Design a protein with these regions (language model features):
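Radical SAM enzyme [4Fe-4S]-AdoMet core and its adjacent flexible, acidic
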Residues: 5-152, 158-165
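Membrane-interface junctions of multi-pass transporters
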Residues: 130-134, 157-186
């Protein structure tokens, strides 16, 4: 399976949040992965700029995507700037976006999960119809690969710890790295 971060169904919004003109490549990657028969999931960090998430789900479904995850905008990398922090959704705003998203995902036959631990109470998430209660999956259920091949504990872990390079290091060496094992144990 493969997960692709898609910030929006609108090129201008996706590109503004990513900081580069990458929407076309992102969509092409999704289409190629679906055409190759891979299980494709999109991930969308939610903020005030892309709060029309239901439209993104509709777009993803039209590309053949059946799995989606979303999260709050995690303050890491360039998302720590004052302007970026100002776009974070409040708990009530996030709940409203998720309520619409759960309904749309169900109508499209998509599976939707929210992946930000401790952002919303478990009761709220269950009340919205979300079955999976988020917990940190760094080095356990997910890792991320940066454009140069560097492996990091998760897509939100963009500073500090690196676990190897997928282009030059065997996967087993990366997986069994003491840092990786320590993060899994936390």
């Amino acid at each position: 399976s493969v997960q692709v971060t898609l910030y929006s169904d609108k090129a201008a919004v996706h590109n503004a949040l990513v900081g580069v003109d990458g929407f076309g490549d992102t969509v092409a990657g999704i289409k190629n992965a679906v055409a190759a028969g891979l299980i494709v999931s999109i991930n969308t960090p939610l903020c005030s700029v892309n709060r029309d998430y239901a439209d993104t789900l509709r777009f993803a479904a039209s590309l053949g995507v059946r799995y989606a995850t979303c999260s709050g905008l995690i303050p890491s990398g360039s998302a720590t700037t004052e302007g970026s922090v100002a776009t974070r959704l409040s708990a009530s705003e996030l709940e409203d976006v998720l309520r619409d998203a759960v309904e749309i995902a169900a109508s499209l036959g998509m599976e939707l999960d929210f992946t930000s631990p401790d952002w919303l109470p478990e009761e709220t998430l269950r009340g919205l119809g979300l079955r999976l209660i988020p917990s940190c999956g760094a080095c356990l259920s997910n890792m991320a690969i940066t454009p140069d091949g560097t492996v990091v504990p998760c897509q939100s872990w963009l500073g500090g710890v690196t676990l190897g390079n997928i282009l030059t290091d065997p996967w087993e060496k990366i997986w069994t790295d003491p840092q990786c094992a320590a993060i899994r144990a936390e």
